[in-house]
Design a protein with these regions (language model features):
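Surface-exposed loop/turn segments flanking beta-strands in extracellular/periplasmic regions
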Residues: 1-8, 52-67, 107-135
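Outer-membrane beta-barrel transmembrane strands
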Residues: 6-45, 49-53, 69-88, 108-110, ...
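Residue-level detector of the transmembrane beta-barrel scaffold of outer-membrane proteins
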Residues: 37-39, 94-98, 160-162, 184, ...
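A cross-taxa feature marking solvent-exposed loop/turn segments within ectodomains of secreted
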Residues: 90-92
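Glycine-rich, aromatic-flanked loop segments that form ligand/cofactor-binding clefts
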Residues: 100-107
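Short, basic alpha-helical nucleic acid-contact segments in DNA-binding proteins
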Residues: 106, 188-189
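Outer-membrane beta-barrel domain signature, especially the mid-to-C-terminal portions
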Residues: 127, 176, 182-184
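Solvent-exposed loop/turn segments connecting transmembrane beta-strands
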Residues: 171-177
């Protein structure tokens, strides 16, 4: 069994990482009248990771050294709209209801380049590769559009009926079967 030099592994087999991120949100709430409210919001999260992998010459598994770079860019955008209704009636009924929609967009782009063997030991640059650069790119795109509703009907705060429903359309499912609905109904006292 080949055991590596612990000093070399600890101090020279490094994985430097640089990360940049941004999270932003914007929202607005409007009271339309005594019974209706409207809310709109959007949130955006973006990250960019720049990663490296350094393996010096004579490292176990990397006799000629190794250098890898990865640039991972991803973002997610989430936007919602929601209309709510609330009313108490003179006959003891109270109704709270809401209907809305959501759009979620997610994207990842990962690009990797690797030098499997270094011309000059300790120089971690792709231009220092012994042979051609190995590269790989992965792209992931996902989008989910949703509509949803909820209603709560109460009678004298003793009998309750709750109904909810949500339908999602996902870009990662086959177009003919990309929709799924999940309802719920409950009665309680």
């Amino acid at each position: 069994k080949n055991i590596g030099n612990p000093f070399l592994t600890l101090y020279e087999c490094v994985n430097p990482t640089e990360k940049h991120s941004n999270i932003s949100m914007l929202s607005a709430n409007l009271k339309l009248n005594n019974h209706f409210d409207f809310m709109i919001r959007s949130a955006f999260q973006m990250e960019n990771d720049i990663r490296e992998q350094h393996r010096p010459v004579s490292t176990v598994g990397f006799a000629k050294g190794y250098f890898k770079t990865q640039n991972i860019f991803n973002y997610e955008l989430n936007s919602d709209v929601l209309l709510t209704y609330h009313n108490s009636f003179s006959n003891g009924l109270t109704l709270n209801a809401a209907a809305g929609g959501n759009m979620m967009v997610y994207k990842v782009n990962m690009l990797s380049n690797a030098a499997n063997g270094l011309i000059t030991p300790g120089v971690y640059k792709l231009a220092n590769a012994i042979s051609s650069i190995e590269w790989d790119q992965k792209i992931l795109n996902k989008r989910v559009n949703s509509i949803y509703f909820t209603a709560n009907l109460a009678y004298k705060n003793k009998l309750f009926l709750d109904i909810t429903g949500r339908n999602d359309w996902s870009s990662t499912l086959p177009k003919k079967n990309n929709s799924f609905f999940y309802p719920s109904v409950s009665v309680s006292t």
